[in-house]
């Protein structure tokens, strides 16, 4: 079966807007393992660290963020797994 031009088969190219890192800038928040409210925004509902391609955090700040989350987990401020 042949599809005509009116079938809507053409796709527009996906335009991805580059987001800026929320931790870089003049009044950006500091990454601190004691700031549970900030860290919980970068942990999924299952307790996993959200990747930087979703959160738009730079590579350097993503490493700092992961270290802070792991520190908070070790001290019992954040859970390892959320059921």
From Swiss-Prot:
Keyword RNA-binding: yes
UniProt xrefs under SUPFAM superfamilies: Ribosomal protein S18
One GO cellular component term noted in the UniProt record for this chain: cytosolic small ribosomal subunit
Gene Ontology biological process terms in this record: translation
One matching Pfam family: Ribosomal_S18
Keywords on record: Ribonucleoprotein, Ribosomal protein, RNA-binding, rRNA-binding
Gene3D superfamilies reported in the protein's UniProt record: Ribosomal protein S18 (4.10.640.10)
GO molecular function, one term: structural constituent of ribosome
Family: Belongs to the bacterial ribosomal protein bS18 family.
Function according to Swiss-Prot or TrEMBL: Binds as a heterodimer with protein bS6 to the central domain of the 16S rRNA, where it helps stabilize the platform of the 30S subunit.
Oligomeric and partner information: Part of the 30S ribosomal subunit. Forms a tight heterodimer with protein bS6.
Name listed for the protein in its UniProt record: Small ribosomal subunit protein bS18
Gene: rpsR
